[in-house]
C-alpha cells in the first residue's frame, strides 16, 4: 500500500535543514511514496535551455536511501515565466476571446505546437535522467488536466476535428446540429466558432461536440507528453490525476474520463470530501464517496490510486473544517475498501507562502511530529503496513449503475424539464444508496463497458441514448439481465436531436410501454405513488405512461394522471425490464430494490447486521475476503457477524456482536470456503 504524497522540495532549496527534516519525518509518519516535481518546471529549467537537475538528483537519492519510492511528475501543469514571455502563443484564450496573462496554473493552450514541443523536451530529459533510478515507481503526467482554450489555433483544430467527424460534409454537420433553428446554418467551415457567451451558445449539438473536442484535444496533449516516457521507460506505469467536486463528489465535468481512462495504466484521483459539513450526515457523504470511488475503480475494472487527499482541512472551501479525531483513518480505510491501493496527500509539507499555505499537510508550519494531525497520519501508515496483502485485490459486483459524461453534458444543456432540478448524478446517488446501505457491491460503469457480467443494470435519466447504446441495453435484457430505467431517458440521440415518432421502438419493445408526457413539478407540489400497498412521496418529475404489454406495478395518487401507472415491469425474452416514471423517495428505492435483490438472490458483501450509517465492504482474491467494517455515525454502534473473521490489525478473532466506536473502522480477513 502506497502512503505519502505531494512533496515540493523545490520550494525549500534554500533550507537544507528543512529537507533533512523531511527525510526524518517521512520515517516517523510511516510513509513510503512521494509524488515529486508536479510544479517544478522553473526549478528544473530556470532559463530556456539551462537545466538544474542537481536538487532533484539529491531528492531521488535521499528518498531511495530512506526506503521510499517516487512518483515523478511531468511539469506541464504550470510553466515558467520565461516560456510565456518568449512564446505568448502558449497562453490560453478564454470563451470571451480574452487572452490570459501569465500566472496561476493549468492555463496553457493544449493545441500550441510550441507548448507541446517544450513539454515533450523536458519530459524526455526527465525520462533519460531518472528512468533507470530504482526509486522511480510511476509517472504522474501533468496535474489535474482541465480547462479549455479558444485561441485561433484551437479554432482551427476544432474545425479540423469537425471535418473529420462529419466526413468533410458541412450539410451533415448542419443536420446534426439542427442549424436552421434561428437561421444558424453554416455554409463554410471557417464560419464555425467554439461556444461563447458573446457568440453562439444555443446550438446544443455545437456545445456537445465542443466538449468532445476538448476531451480529445486534452488526450492528444497527454499522448504527446508520454511519447518520450513510453520510449525510454516502457515498463514504468503512467497515470494522471482525475478530479471530482467536493460537495456531492460529482465527477469532474470538464473532460470525459471514460475516454481518458483508456490511455492510462492506472486510474488515480484527488478526493476532498467536505467531512463534517452542516447540510448532510457523515453517512450520506460517505455514500457519495463510495459512489465516486466505485466509478473510478470501474473505469478500468482494477484498483485505483488515491493521489491526493488532505489529512486535516483544505483551504478552498467556504468553511475549512478540520477532520475530527478518527475521521482521517476512517476516511482512508473507506478509500481502500472501495478499491484504492494508496493513501497519498496534498501536501507533505505546508507551503510558507502563496495560495496554499493554509492547505492541510502532514507537516505543518510548526515542523512538528507531535501534533494530532501528524500522529493520525502515522496511524494510517501503520494500518496500511498491515494491509499489504490487500493490494491488487478486486471487488466483484452483480449490480451496475450506468453513468455517462456525454449524457450529463447534454442534460445540463437542455432547456427543459426543471432547470435546477435535473440533478443527474445526485439521482444516481439515490439508486446507489439502496445497495450501499445493504453492503451490496456496485460497479458504476459507462455505456461503452461490457454489461454481460451483471445481473442487474440500473440506468437512471439516460436522456441521451444513441441507437448503439439502446441496442446494447436491449441485448443485455434479452440475454437474461434485469434492466431498470427511469424518467427522462431515451429522449435524444448522440447529436442531442430528439427521437421523432415517440419513444424509440426498441425501448417500447423492451419495456412494453411508452412515456408520453413528463410533468415537471414545483418544489411545493405534492403527489405520491402507491407501490405494494404503500404510499411514496414523489418530487420534481412525473411521467405519464401508455402501456401496451407492460405490467403496472405502481400508480400515481393525485393530479390529472391519478390512478395511472407510474412504475412498470415487463418480461423481455430471457430477462426483465422495469421503468420508474417518477422521482421517488429513498424509501421507495430501498423497498423497490429490496424486492429485486430477493428475486435475483443478490448477496451482500458479508452476512452482518448493523444500524444505518455503518458500511461493510469487501475486497477479495482467490483465497481470502478482506472485510472493512466502518462506522460513519457519531455514536457507538453494534455490529453482529454471522461468522468469525480475523482482525488484520490485532490478530484477534471477531465473532458475534462487535462494537464500533464513533468513526471507528475494523479490518478483517476470512478465508474463502
From Swiss-Prot:
The keyword Hydrolase applies. GO terms for biological process: galactose metabolic process. Optimum pH is 6.5 for both lactose and ONPG hydrolysis. Stable at pH 5-8 and most stable at 6.5, retaining more than 90% and 80% of its activity when incubated at pH 6.5 and 37 degrees Celsius for 5 days and 1 month, respectively. Optimum temperature of the activity is 50 degrees Celsius when using both lactose and ONPG as substrates under 10 minutes assay conditions. Stable over a wide range of temperatures (4-42 degrees Celsius), and when kept at these temperatures up to 1 month. Most stable at 37 degrees Celsius, retaining 90% of its activity after 1 month at this temperature. Half-life time of activity of approximately 7 days, 5 hours, and 30 minutes at 55, 60 and 65 degrees Celsius, respectively. Inhibited by hydrolysis end products D-galactose and D-glucose. The hydrolysis of o-nitrophenyl-beta-D-galactopyranoside (ONPG) is slightly activated by monovalent ions, Na(+) and K(+). Concentrations of these ions in the range of 1-100 mM exert the stimulating effects. The presence of 1 mM Mn(2+) together with the presence of 10 mM Na(+) slightly stimulates the activity, while presence of 10 mM Mn(2+) inhibits the activity by about 40%. Substrate binds at residues 105, 143, 316, 356-359. Pfam families: Glyco_hydro_42, Glyco_hydro_42C, Glyco_hydro_42M. One of its GO terms (cellular component) is beta-galactosidase complex. The keyword Hydrolase applies. Has potential for partial lactose removal in food products and improving the quality of dairy products by increasing their solubility and sweetness. Catalyzes the hydrolysis of lactose to its constituent monosaccharides glucose and galactose. Possesses a low level of transgalactosylation activity for the production of galacto-oligosaccharides (GOS) from lactose. This is Beta-galactosidase GalA. The lineage of its organism: Bacteria, Bacillati, Bacillota, Bacilli, Bacillales.
Amino acid at each position: 500500500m502506497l502512503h505519502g504524497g505531494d512533496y515540493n522540495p523545490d520550494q525549500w532549496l534554500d533550507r537544507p535543514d528543512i529537507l533533512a527534516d523531511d527525510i526524518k519525518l517521512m520515517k516517523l509518519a510511516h510513509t513510503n511514496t512521494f509524488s515529486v516535481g508536479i510544479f517544478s518546471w522553473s526549478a528544473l529549467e530556470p532559463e530556456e535551455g539551462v537545466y538544474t537537475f542537481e536538487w532533484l538528483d539529491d531528492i531521488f537519492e535521499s528518498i531511495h536511501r530512506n526506503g521510499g519510492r517516487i512518483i515523478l511528475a511531468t511539469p506541464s501543469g504550470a510553466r515558467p515565466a520565461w516560456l510565456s514571455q518568449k512564446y505568448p502563443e502558449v497562453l490560453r484564450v478564454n470563451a470571451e476571446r480574452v487572452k490570459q496573462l501569465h500566472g496561476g496554473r493549468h492555463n496553457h493552450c493544449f493545441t500550441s505546437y510550441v507548448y507541446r514541443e517544450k513539454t515533450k523536451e523536458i519530459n524526455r530529459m526527465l525520462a533519460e535522467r531518472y528512468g533507470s533510478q530504482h526509486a522511480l515507481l510511476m509517472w504522474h503526467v501533468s496535474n489535474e488536466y482541465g480547462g479549455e482554450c479558444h485561441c485561433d489555433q484551437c479554432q482551427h483544430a476544432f474545425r479540423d476535428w469537425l471535418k473529420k467527424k462529419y466526413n468533410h460534409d458541412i450539410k451533415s454537420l448542419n443536420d446534426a446540429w439542427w442549424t436552421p433553428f434561428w437561421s444558424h446554418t453554416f455554409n463554410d467551415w471557417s464560419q464555425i466558432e467554439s461556444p461563447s457567451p458573446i457568440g453562439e451558445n444555443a446550438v446544443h449539438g455545437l456545445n456537445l461536440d465542443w466538449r468532445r473536442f476538448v476531451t480529445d484535444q486534452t488526450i492528444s496533449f497527454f499522448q504527446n507528453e508520454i511519447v518520450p516516457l513510453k520510449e525510454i521507460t516502457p515498463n514504468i506505469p503512467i497515470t494522471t490525476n482525475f478530479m471530482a467536486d467536493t460537495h456531492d463528489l460529482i465527477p469532474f465535468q470538464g473532460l470525459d474520463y471514460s475516454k481518458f481512462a483508456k490511455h492510462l495504466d492506472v486510474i488515480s484521483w484527488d478526493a476532498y470530501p467536505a467531512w463534517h459539513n452542516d447540510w448532510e450526515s457523515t453517512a450520506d457523504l460517505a455514500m457519495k464517496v463510495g459512489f465516486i470511488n466505485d466509478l473510478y475503480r470501474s473505469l478500468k475494472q482494477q484498483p485505483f490510486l488515491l493521489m491526493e487527499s488532505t489529512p486535516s482541512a483544505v483551504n478552498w472551501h467556504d468553511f475549512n473544517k478540520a477532520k475530527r479525531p478518527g475521521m482521517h483513518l476512517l476516511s482512508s480505510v473507506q478509500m481502500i475498501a472501495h478499491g484504492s491501493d494508496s493513501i497519498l496527500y496534498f501536501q507533505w509539507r505546508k507551503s510558507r507562502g502563496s495560495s496554499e499555505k493554509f492547505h492541510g499537510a502532514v507537516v505543518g508550519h510548526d515542523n512538528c511530529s507531535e501534533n494530532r494531525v501528524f500522529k493520525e497520519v502515522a496511524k494510517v501508515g501503520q494500518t496500511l503496513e498491515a494491509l499489504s496483502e490487500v493490494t491488487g485485490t478486486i471487488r466483484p459486483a452483480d449490480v451496475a449503475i450506468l453513468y455517462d459524461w456525454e449524457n450529463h453534458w447534454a442534460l445540463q444543456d437542455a432547456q427543459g424539464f426543471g432547470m435546477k432540478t435535473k440533478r443527474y448524478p445526485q439521482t444516481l446517488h439515490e439508486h446507489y444508496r439502496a445497495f450501499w446501505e445493504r453492503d451490496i457491491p456496485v460497479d458504476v460503469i459507462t455505456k461503452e463497458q461490457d454489461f454481460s457480467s451483471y445481473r442487474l443494470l440500473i440506468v437512471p435519466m439516460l436522456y441521451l441514448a444513441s441507437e448503439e447504446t439502446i441496442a446494447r441495453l436491449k441485448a443485455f435484457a434479452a440475454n437474461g439481465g434485469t434492466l431498470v430505467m427511469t424518467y427522462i431517458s431515451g429522449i435524444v440521440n448522440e447529436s442531442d436531436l430528439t427521437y421523432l415518432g415517440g419513444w424509440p421502438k426498441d425501448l417500447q419493445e423492451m419495456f412494453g410501454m411508452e412515456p408520453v408526457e413528463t410533468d415537471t413539478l414545483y418544489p411545493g407540489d405534492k403527489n405520491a405513488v402507491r407501490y405494494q400497498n404503500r404510499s411514496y412521496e414523489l418530487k420534481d418529475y412525473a411521467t405519464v405512461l401508455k402501456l401496451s404489454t407492460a405490467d403496472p406495478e405502481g400508480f400515481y395518487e393525485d393530479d390529472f394522471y391519478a390512478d395511472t401507472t407510474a412504475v412498470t415491469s415487463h418480461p423481455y425474452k430471457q430477462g426483465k425490464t422495469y421503468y420508474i416514471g417518477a422521482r421517488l423517495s429513498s424509501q421507495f428505492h430501498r423497498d423497490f430494490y429490496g424486492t429485486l435483490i430477493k428475486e435475483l438472490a443478490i448477496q451482500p458483501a458479508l452476512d452482518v447486521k448493523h444500524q444505518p450509517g455503518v458500511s461493510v465492504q469487501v475486497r477479495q482474491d482467490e483465497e481470502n475476503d478482506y472485510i472493512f467494517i466502518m462506522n460513519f455515525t457519531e455514536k457507538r454502534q453494534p455490529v453482529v457477524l454471522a461468522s468469525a473473521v480475523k482482525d488484520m490489525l490485532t490478530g484477534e478473532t471477531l465473532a458475534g456482536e462487535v462494537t464500533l466506536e464513533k468513526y471507528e473502522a475494523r479490518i478483517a480477513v476470512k478465508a474463502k470456503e
